[in-house]
């Protein structure tokens, strides 16, 4: 879909390990696109990643990106190490890690991090950037009149006199969505009043 819909030279963001192979397909189909990939889960160390039967295909695909990002420098280094040792990517210079990433006693601290990789004539920028929230802003917005009125509209539109049960989670087989639906089914079977 991204290949068919993206404008000439657009940036396509790909998210998480479920789509490891997507950048390679996108690059083959649309070499004009800028491809960014963000890995939302820990990228394993070489000793674990090297066991995967598709390790080379995964790395070659991710190395089709213009930018590959991870939450913390350790995961960035794990990826850089895998790419250099398993498929021969060339490592760019290491740069100092932002102090917010370095805490005494933190097992995942890195003092420096690889800035980029070179592979098949391409430069792949590496990014360490935790995805976080701004609790103060969320709290402020939560109680604002506009959000409260939107909330009321949602309640009126969705409930319509019914009970509403909501679950918010990632659509990933490891998150137990099927089990959640089965549990809900059992609840409805046992509690006819719901």
Can you annotate each of these PLM segments?
Residues 1-194:
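Catalytic cores of carbohydrate-active enzymes across secretory and cytosolic contexts
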């Amino acid at each position: 879909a991204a290949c068919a819909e993206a404008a000439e030279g657009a940036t396509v963001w790909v998210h998480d390990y479920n789509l490891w192979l997507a950048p390679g397909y996108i690059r083959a189909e649309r070499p004009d696109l800028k491809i960014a990939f963000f890995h939302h889960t820990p990228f394993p160390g070489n000793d674990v990643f090297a066991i995967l039967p598709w390790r080379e295909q995964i790395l070659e695909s991710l190395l089709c990106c213009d930018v590959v990002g991870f939450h913390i420098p350790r995961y960035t280094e794990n990826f850089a190490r895998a790419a250099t040792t398993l498929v021969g990517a060339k490592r760019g210079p290491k740069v100092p890690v932002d102090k917010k990433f370095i805490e005494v006693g933190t097992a995942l601290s890195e003092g420096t991090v690889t800035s980029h990789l070179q592979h098949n004539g391409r430069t792949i920028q590496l990014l360490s950037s935790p995805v976080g929230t701004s609790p103060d802003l969320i709290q402020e917005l939560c109680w604002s009149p506009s959000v409260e009125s939107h909330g009321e509209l949602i309640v009126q539109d969705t409930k319509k006199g019914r009970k509403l049960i909501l679950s918010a989670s990632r659509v990933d087989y490891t998150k137990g969505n099927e089990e959640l639906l089965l549990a809900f089914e059992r609840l409805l079977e046992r509690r006819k009043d719901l």
